[in-house]
């Protein structure tokens, strides 16, 4: 008796699931792939809780020096407690694949673990991944080469996030 009830319940359940009236459909075209914050340049700003990425929706960067100029010229969004600790001047950046080199006139003023260095590293890593779509921002390593003093790096953006 128990077996009959179990079989009947299973058959009834299967019939209910397959008989819901939804007809199969073919492939539905949905247009272009999704886009949003994962594309485009982001500038990184400092806050008491760490670095925060700010997307630049209406700006285009043609090279890494353009990203540096944007970082120096763009005010952080108001009301979020974000600031820029980077004072630009005497920096130039070049990139190839996953490597970015920042050349500085004179000694580099950052310690390598400060938020100003993080702003530069993360902004340049993101810009390099936009300029070379085969490169992931997480894989970019930035090295600072001052005209005076020792090189600093290579540094990755992840070292500065989540602090």
Label the model's feature ranges:
Residues 2-163:
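Bimodal "functional hotspot" detector
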């Amino acid at each position: 008796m128990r077996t009959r009830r179990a079989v009947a319940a299973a058959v009834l359940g299967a019939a209910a699931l397959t008989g819901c009236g939804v007809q199969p459909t073919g492939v539905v075209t949905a247009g272009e792939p999704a886009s949003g914050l994962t594309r485009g340049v982001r500038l990184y700003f400092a806050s008491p809780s760490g670095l925060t990425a700010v997307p630049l929706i209406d700006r285009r960067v043609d090279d890494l020096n353009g990203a540096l100029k944007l970082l120096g010229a763009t005010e952080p969004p108001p009301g979020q407690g974000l600031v820029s600790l980077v004072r630009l001047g005497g920096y130039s950046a070049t990139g190839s694949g996953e490597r970015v080199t920042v050349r500085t006139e004179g000694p580099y003023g950052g310690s390598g673990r400060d938020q100003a260095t993080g702003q530069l590293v993360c902004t340049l890593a993101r810009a390099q991944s936009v300029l070379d779509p085969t490169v992931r921002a997480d894989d970019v390593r930035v090295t600072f080469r001052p005209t005076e003093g020792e090189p600093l790096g290579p540094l990755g953006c992840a070292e500065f996030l989540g602090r």
